[in-house]
Amino acid sequence: MVLGMLVVLALSAPADAAYGPDLQSASVATSADETAIRKVIGDYAKAIETKDLELFKTVKPNLTLEEEKRARSAFASIQSQVVKITFLSIDMKEHQAVVKVTRRDTINGSIPGAFPQTFTMNKGRTGWVIAEIGR
């Protein structure tokens, strides 16, 4: 009976509640900058999930032509993708931040596994943006 209720609750939860980025850390109160950084990373995940190249360019405005080409190719080859981001650390120094996460994608219904990602971010006049994405 309990197992049945858990299955129903899991299935009735909104998709972004189950797979969206962990925008708030339960253990530490976040600063306005940390909250903004987490939102940008969340928008990055949303851009991938929704195949929204314009949103991708908003969070990573220095996107190169090669990166754009790879993104278009990936978006075209994947039917569905859910991106789960788990924040490991946010190291801020003035107008730069290094954000370490674990990312787990569900691609076309399959979970190929989790992998680390490191984002180098810059804060400009319009707020935080992704400068580099690495592993």
Regions found by a protein language model. Give the residues of each.
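Intrinsically disordered, low-complexity regions enriched in Ser/Pro/Gly/Gln/His and often acidic
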Residues: S12-A13, I37, T120-N122
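Juxtamembrane and targeting peptides
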Residues: M1-S31, V98
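Short solvent-exposed beta->alpha transition segments
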Residues: G20, V28-V98
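Exposed beta-sheet edge and beta->alpha loop/turn motif
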Residues: M92-R135
